[in-house]
Amino acid sequence: MNAEINPLHAYFKLPNTVSLVAGSSEGETPLNAFDGALLNAGIGNVNLIRISSIMPPEAEIVPLPKLPMGALVPTAYGYIISDVPGETISAAISVAIPKDKSLCGLIMEYEGKCSKKEAEKTVREMAKIGFEMRGWELDRIESIAVEHTVEKLGCAFAAAALWYK
């Protein structure tokens, strides 16, 4: 084994793309609403492996590729489910990209009883604060959000799905 490679990483290839997705749905049950939101976001037929909030260095933000059904997809996500008719719920995800491309990016997720605009503003501010905490220079922030007005039982979902070129 190459002495420069961390033994853990010798077994796992780091993802090199990130796709920001968001969706919402109504459902008969909370799980059906969540599943519908995943389908609406384009990632309903894969297995999400929930990760914390780090984007590998030099990973690119790309449109969601066609993922193989059943694939294990590392994903940072936020979601909210509500059964209050008329309530507005939103979910948002952001990725902060460093100026120094040898550093990792930072993914932040947010969900709340608020507008899409408020959720996206909050998640972008969280990414900025995360970079300030690390003392890193920010190049840019990419984000996406979704808003849903509950009819009976609804879900809003936003995610950063990591994958491979």
Swiss-Prot record:
This is Pyruvoyl-dependent arginine decarboxylase. It is an enzyme of class 4 (lyase). Gene3D superfamilies: 3.30.60.30, Pyruvoyl-Dependent Histidine Decarboxylase, subunit B (3.50.20.10). GO terms for molecular function: arginine decarboxylase activity. Binds 1 pyruvoyl group covalently per subunit. Trimer of an alpha-beta dimer. Its EC number is 4.1.1.19. InterPro entries: Pyr-dep_his/arg-deCO2ase, Pyr-dep_his/arg-deCO2ase_sand, Pyruvoyl-dep_arg_deCO2ase. It catalyses: L-arginine + H(+) = agmatine + CO2. Keywords: Decarboxylase, Lyase, Pyruvate. The record marks 52-53 as: Cleavage (non-hydrolytic). It holds the Pfam family PvlArgDC. Belongs to the PdaD family. The gene is pdaD. One of its GO terms (biological process) is arginine catabolic process. The modification Pyruvic acid (Ser) is found at residue 53. It comes from Methanocaldococcus jannaschii (strain ATCC 43067 / DSM 2661 / JAL-1 / JCM 10045 / NBRC 100440). The lineage of its organism: Archaea, Methanobacteriati, Methanobacteriota, Methanomada group, Methanococci. Thermostable. Its cofactor is pyruvate.
